[in-house]
Amino acid sequence: MNPKNFAKAGLVAALVVAANASVAGPDNMVVAVQQLPVIVEPQGINNNALDRVAYSIYETLIRADLKTGEFFPGLAESWKRVSPESVEFKLRKGVKFHDGTDFTADDVVFTFGQERFMAKDAPGRAAAVEFLGGLKSVEKIDDYTVRVTMQQADPLIERRFAARMSEIISKDGWMKAGGWDNWIKNPIGTGPYRITSFKVGNRLALERFDGYWGDKAPAAKLTFVEVPELSSRVAGLRSGEFDLITEVPPDQIKPLSKDGKIDVVGGAIDNIYALVFDAKSNPVMANPKLRQGIMHAIDRDLLVQALFAGKTTPANSFQSKTFGEMYLPEFETKKFDLQKARELIKASGYKGEQIVWRIQPAYYTLEMTVSQAVASMLKQAGLNIRLDVKENWTQVEAAGKDRMINNASFSAYFPDPASQLWRRMKPGSFWEAEGYFPASDEYKRICELGKELDSSVDPVRRKAVWGEMLKLFDANPYAVPLYSLPMIYAKQKNVVWEPGTQGSLDLSARGLSFK
């Protein structure tokens, strides 16, 4: 799509909100996002757009604080380990789904069952397998007790069932809908807000769920509206049409902060912005030396200082300091070395063939600007780069010989390496299933080690395994990290809200209030 058309689309969306919404505030909170998800079923897709809205609609058995990662009871009142492979959950009584039906163990079993997830061709499996591929069974012990069992010992069961893809849905709602195709038109959760309408590419309208078991939602109505153009989001915020806007670039922080009615919040989150390579579809990308050359050609420090005013940090490896003892600082040494990049590219046998890099104009903060800057760096290293602007993820990730590089983010959905690089690269993950990764000795070994990372309960061994995985990935990179993804927001001053370390927005009574 022509960038001018994106601007028009953003203006139209803003006008639609202005025409249909009352004054922004606790009666009708409006959040302007750069892109809405194409589906609001929690296992429908894995991306930042769905992360942003799912937290308001659905709940997991365990809740993890979005700022600290600390556990607190969700749909389960308590839980205990019964073996290295199993956790037993005692479910909360008196919880209602948005359609008024009772939440019981049957809903938990169905959520992870054959029809939705466990079967090989189940509709939720493609997105959720990266998170829950090791699940063996979810058994009903009684109406308010379930036992989750993994295929092998797993030190992270509790983390997995507090993260995305583990949100509980209504079995009764699914059955009445007659299956996935109708269900996704009006999915039902237990969260503080319920869906009233959803139009892809336009708006997602929610309302306070009066039957919610916990503290009532602070906003009577909550609307997410798609406004791709930054200037339209900013204009809507200044005029009072929007309460909160996403994807604010650093150069807008000072101008917006000078507005006495607006606050700017946020910063780097536990998510690494990166380039992903299809090393299989086109022989140009097959040689690991060429991909290593790309890794060393990018000046991450310059990107962070010049484009993000130091509001984020460079990433030289796929790690987060929230990993604690599993964080390996020795892998964070600077990768930028232009001479080394040129030598590796020459050694790869590269002959100047065009390398296509598919991007979207503004899915990520400054996506176009960053892509142009990095493309310039890669050209200095001797690569013939062509940026190919696409409208959506379907076009970006469509199979073909011109699928060579695309932008992506690597969220750490919980503070452990298993939640980030390995989750996105393991067998059965989206990119592996879509044919991005060719067979190689390094990838085979990474997969062997990844299984051990998922199953070992020995912290010392897990740390050693993770270090070996990072070494192998540097030797044959299928992606290269750039920086921690910044998530900067601007909001009305009467909105009391702070973002966490994830892309999810907590707009419940725990996270939101109004002055």
Predicted regions and their residues:
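Gly/Pro-rich hinge or "lid" segments in bacterial periplasmic/extracellular proteins
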Residues: 65, 70, 162-217, 221, ...
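Ligand-site clamp/hinge motif
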Residues: 181, 209-255, 384
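A structural "hinge/loop" feature
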Residues: 35-52, 75, 101, 156-167, ...
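Aromatic- and charge-enriched surface segment that lines or borders ligand/interaction sites
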Residues: 77-121, 147-149, 233-236, 284-286
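Detector for C-terminal structural segments
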Residues: 199, 273, 297-326, 365-375, ...
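Surface-exposed binding/hinge segments that line
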Residues: 23, 80, 127-173
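Structural transition elements
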Residues: 281, 313-347, 363-368
